[in-house]
Amino acid sequence: MDPWPWLTAALLLLLLLVQLSRTARFYAKVGLYCVLCLSFSAAASIVCLLRHGGRTVDNMSIISWFVRSFKYVYGLRFEVSGQKKLEVDGPCVIISNHQSILDMMGLMEILPKRCVQIAKRELMFTGPVGLIMYLGGVYFINRQQARTAMSVMADLGDLMVKENLKVWIYPEGTRNDNGDLLPFKKGAFYLAIQAQVPIIPVVYSSFSSFYNVKTKLFTSGTIKVQVLDAVPTNGLTDADVTKLVDTCYQSMRATFLQISQIPQENSAIKEPGVLPAQ
């Protein structure tokens, strides 16, 4: 029996569902995003291996080029303020808020040279995506084993100074779409103090106007990005971590609410919180 009529009918039915159902459109776009991530990761891995032969932070420029094309597929626009503040000569720790699977597009849109990320170890085993992250120099941390995670962070602190690396970290530790920032974990701040390098906060506006898992919304939209002034850590010690976390949290939260046009009294979290290093 010829399968093509059935396949054609199934495709037409899927297209009809996408047109008529907001939920179907949402899952279709998320599914396409996953397919893009897998296929582009495979293609980028080949390019990285041919160009640089293995794992190196220099592969990040190739990865960034591939990922920046995603915004055209989804009709997303980025309005960036203060990007030149990321163009520092020396090493630094970059921190930003973490909202959804779309954060990767925002990160790659403004990724500075010689910048690596920290990610949970489970992502290393996600096929082509894990491979391209490894080739790009991403540092994987096993968050279930605190001692191992702290050891990796300590090694990274020495390496970032030695090799002049910028390290991008999401201090909330997990994706969050509640209309506010979650309390920050301390790991990024211990790292900056250990290496005596500045912290550069980056804030992305809320995605809720065009992407919302709960309401199955996924349309085109504009993302505002604001790079804040660097926060120095020269002379600070571990005893100053809590104050440093609070300083960064307060400035990032105020900026997030402002560029997202969310009144502070309507935000989900009223008081900043600090979580243990992880």
Swiss-Prot record:
The chain crosses the membrane at residues 30-50, 122-142. Coiled coil: none annotated. It comes from the Eukaryota. It catalyses: a 1-acyl-sn-glycero-3-phosphate + an acyl-CoA = a 1,2-diacyl-sn-glycero-3-phosphate + CoA; 1-(9Z-octadecenoyl)-sn-glycero-3-phosphate + (9Z)-octadecenoyl-CoA = 1,2-di-(9Z-octadecenoyl)-sn-glycero-3-phosphate + CoA; 1-(9Z-octadecenoyl)-sn-glycero-3-phosphate + hexadecanoyl-CoA = 1-(9Z)-octadecenoyl-2-hexadecanoyl-sn-glycero-3-phosphate + CoA; heptadecanoyl-CoA + 1-(9Z-octadecenoyl)-sn-glycero-3-phosphate = 1-(9Z)-octadecenoyl-2-heptadecanoyl-sn-glycero-3-phosphate + CoA. Residues 24-29, 143-278 are lumenal. GO terms for cellular component: endoplasmic reticulum; endoplasmic reticulum membrane. InterPro entries: AGP_acyltrans, Plipid/glycerol_acylTrfase. GO terms for molecular function: 1-acylglycerol-3-phosphate O-acyltransferase activity. Expressed at high levels in the liver, at intermediate levels in the kidney, gut, heart and skeletal muscles. Undetectable in brain and spleen. A motif (HXXXXD motif) lies at residues 98-103. A motif (EGTR motif) lies at residues 172-175. Keywords: Acyltransferase, Endoplasmic reticulum, Lipid biosynthesis, Lipid metabolism, Membrane, Phospholipid biosynthesis, Phospholipid metabolism, Signal, Transferase, Transmembrane, Transmembrane helix. It is found in: Endoplasmic reticulum membrane. One of its GO terms (biological process) is CDP-diacylglycerol biosynthetic process. Its EC number is 2.3.1.51. Pathway: Phospholipid metabolism; CDP-diacylglycerol biosynthesis; CDP-diacylglycerol from sn-glycerol 3-phosphate: step 2/3. Induction: Down-regulated in the heart by clofibrate, a PPAR-alpha agonist. Residues 51-121 are cytoplasmic. It is a multi-pass membrane protein. Residues 1-23 form the signal peptide. Belongs to the 1-acyl-sn-glycerol-3-phosphate acyltransferase family. NCBIfam families: AGP_acyltrn (TIGR00530). Converts 1-acyl-sn-glycerol-3-phosphate (lysophosphatidic acid or LPA) into 1,2-diacyl-sn-glycerol-3-phosphate (phosphatidic acid or PA) by incorporating an acyl moiety at the sn-2 position of the glycerol backbone. The HXXXXD motif is essential for acyltransferase activity and may constitute the binding site for the phosphate moiety of the glycerol-3-phosphate. This is 1-acyl-sn-glycerol-3-phosphate acyltransferase beta. The lineage of its organism: Eukaryota, Metazoa, Chordata, Craniata, Vertebrata. The gene is Agpat2.
